[in-house]
Amino acid sequence: MADQTISNVLNQPQWRCLESKIEKSTLHYGRFIISPLWKGQANTIGLALRRTLLSEVEGTCITSVKIKNAIHEYSSLSGVQESVHDILINLKKIILSSSFSGIFEGFLSVVGPKTVLASDLNLPSFIKIVNPDQYIATVNKPINFNLQIYIQKGKGYSLKNPISIKQGFFLVDPVFIPIRSVNYSIHSFEDEKATKEFLIVEVWTNGSIEPKEAIKEASYNLVNLFTPLVSQEYQQLKNQLFKEDEKNKELNFIETNSNAISDNENSYNLYNQIFLDQLELSSRAYNSLKKNNINTISDLLKYSYEDLLKIKNFGKKSADQVIEQLKKRFKIQL
């Protein structure tokens, strides 16, 4: 029993960090593995995770700025080397990190002559500047140089911000994407006569979030996306079956869910939500079953071994494969 429990745990997909390093303050790298996976699952997870990392992970940016004495975006400021447009571009390059959502205010007030850097900004204590050496402007005369900025957390691209319509404020055109790049690769291996896969994911961030945390956030977003699609009844059934499996009991849908299913319902209804592709049959066997309107495990359980042999183009080899997969995956003896 203990050996079987250990085997069940080892067969559950698990994440592990293979490598983590800081190449520079604005470039953090992480390499991860998830294994074991059934054939085809690695590509499904890799594609969904990559797209979610690049579009759904939140970032913190300066969204708008008010510059004293600035008339319009392409105007020049007396005593300042850069135009307003150049200052906005430099502010956009500042990388911020914050665990709080909302709109926050920051200030900058210096007296020239001075080279103005991101480290000269006065921000709330919970907002960290990842690249404090980021250049903003050069004040080449003994004048006051003042900025008022707004900071916000968001996802993806923001081309419009209500704050920017206030008089004297300029939109910084922020990009709320802390992920610089994502790569994934799929590798196969043999396990107990079955071909399985493992997924390698590489993540580069701008330093405002660690790759490991980005993976977690993207995974949570995917879970939250699919959760509403799962009915309450099916979720309860899944939870009950998981508990039974952890106790190393036979995977018997009827017995483990007797309290959730009325007496007049037959056992096949429990398998209506499990489709044939979960058995990973050969193309010939799968197509033959589909042609005979056998789409779910529930449909399949209506057939005996002898009945399967009577199906056109469904030979003994295919029937034996069905028997083996039902027993292996669902502990069902047809």
Curated annotation (Swiss-Prot):
Organism of this sequence: Chaetosphaeridium globosum (Charophycean green alga)
Top EC group: transferase
Pfam family, one: RNA_pol_L
Protein name, UniProt field: DNA-directed RNA polymerase subunit alpha
Reactions catalysed, as given in the entry: RNA(n) + a ribonucleoside 5'-triphosphate = RNA(n+1) + diphosphate
MF terms (GO), sorted A to Z: DNA binding; DNA-directed RNA polymerase activity; protein dimerization activity
Similarity section: Belongs to the RNA polymerase alpha chain family.
EC number: 2.7.7.6
Function: DNA-dependent RNA polymerase catalyzes the transcription of DNA into RNA using the four ribonucleoside triphosphates as substrates.
Record remark: domains: The N-terminal domain is essential for RNAP assembly and basal transcription, whereas the C-terminal domain is involved in interaction with transcriptional regulators and with upstream promoter elements.
This protein's record includes keyword DNA damage: no
GO annotations of cellular component type: chloroplast; DNA-directed RNA polymerase complex; mitochondrion
Annotated stretches, region: Alpha C-terminal domain (alpha-CTD): 263-334
Xref: CDD domains: RNAP_alpha_NTD
GO annotation, biological process: DNA-templated transcription
Main localization, broad class: plastid
HAMAP family according to UniProt: RNApol_bact_RpoA
SUPFAM superfamilies: C-terminal domain of RNA polymerase alpha subunit, Insert subdomain of RNA polymerase alpha subunit, RBP11-like subunits of RNA polymerase
Keywords assigned: Chloroplast, DNA-directed RNA polymerase, Nucleotidyltransferase, Plastid, Transcription, Transferase
NCBIfam families: rpoA
UniProt keyword annotation of Ligase present: no
